[in-house]
Amino acid sequence: MAAGVPCALVTSCSATFTGDRLVQHILGTEDAVVEATSSDAVRFYPWTIDNKYYSAEINLCVVPSKFLVTAEIAESVQAFVVYFDSTQKSGLDSVSSWLPLAEAWLAEVMILVCDRVCDDGINRQQAQEWCIKHGFELVELNPEELPEEDDDFPESTGVKRIVQALNANVWSNVVMKSDRSQGFSLLNSLAGANRRVASAESCHSEQQEPSPTAERTESLPGHHSGACGSAGAQVDSIVDPMLDLDIQELASLTTGGGDLENFERLFSKLKEMKDKAATLPHEQRKLHAEKVAKAFWMAIGGDRDEIEGLSSDDEH
């Protein structure tokens, strides 16, 4: 593996669907070039992400077992894609064994993949609750329910959604294209939101016994002194694991070209975020909207001074 090349770590917890097959779906080829390691256990698939905003050289790194993750691989992980067998009631148990590593990597893109949810194994509600708790996005390769044909803003599904999410990530070696860079110039600060959340949670857990029912999506208590206080102040009460990715994509669409495809995707993303916010209680919805507004303003190059003091408690 070339030094300094970021990677999307891909693994499978299914005996019938390998990580290599998933990578081949992502690359759109059954004849992908494989760079074998000396042990021939971990495999690297070089991939050039080249879109209208940027280009980046990354590796799709297939790791069959968590015990094969070396320090070099761990340092390069910027996305994590894991496949599981939804037909087994214990299908998520093997995935959960990867969580300590995933939490240490703090990857901005984490995707849980299956062929489709299964009522006799892991159903949709179980899969989505697990994803919300641990900060993953659920993607079904062959969902039973496809977007309606007359839907003006159909959501991407399957492999297309995985590719879309990987394209929306801000890779460490990204090379921006011409004037596209403005909207991405501050996305690295947005991409650090998950790291700030993790830091705040870590500080809080050291001061208080963790509750067995606590979830990552619960409100983070604020602290008014010490390192934990500064970390807690950097995040809002509502922590949505997918919010950073949504804002990254929204910012890239806003600062992109004015073509029809870009315009349609922009409205589709706005609709997705609106629908997501609509499920929150009123007070949480206000805080959610405030966080999105602030982060999005910074993402497109807005002046921080112009939004200082902006709060849902302000009187207008």
UniProtKB/Swiss-Prot annotation:
Q: Which residue intervals are annotated with compositional bias (Low complexity) in the record?
A: 222-232
Report keywords, A-Z. Cytoplasm, Phosphoprotein, Protein transport, Transport
Per the UniProt entry, the signal peptide is none
Q: Name one GO cellular component term.
A: nuclear speck
Q: Which GO terms describe its biological process?
A: protein transport
One Pfam annotation reads Adaptin_binding
**Superkingdom classification of source:** Eukaryota
Region named Disordered: 198-232
Annotated positions of the Phosphoserine modification: 311-312
- Where in or outside the cell? Cytoplasm, Cytosol
State the Gene3D superfamilies in the record: 3.40.50.11960
InterPro entries linked to this entry: Alpha/Gamma-adaptin-bd_p34
| Quaternary structure note | Associated with AP-1 and AP-2 complexes.
Task of the protein = May be involved in endocytic recycling of growth factor receptors such as EGFR.
Stated name of the protein: Alpha- and gamma-adaptin-binding protein p34
> Which gene holds the coding sequence for this protein?
Aagab
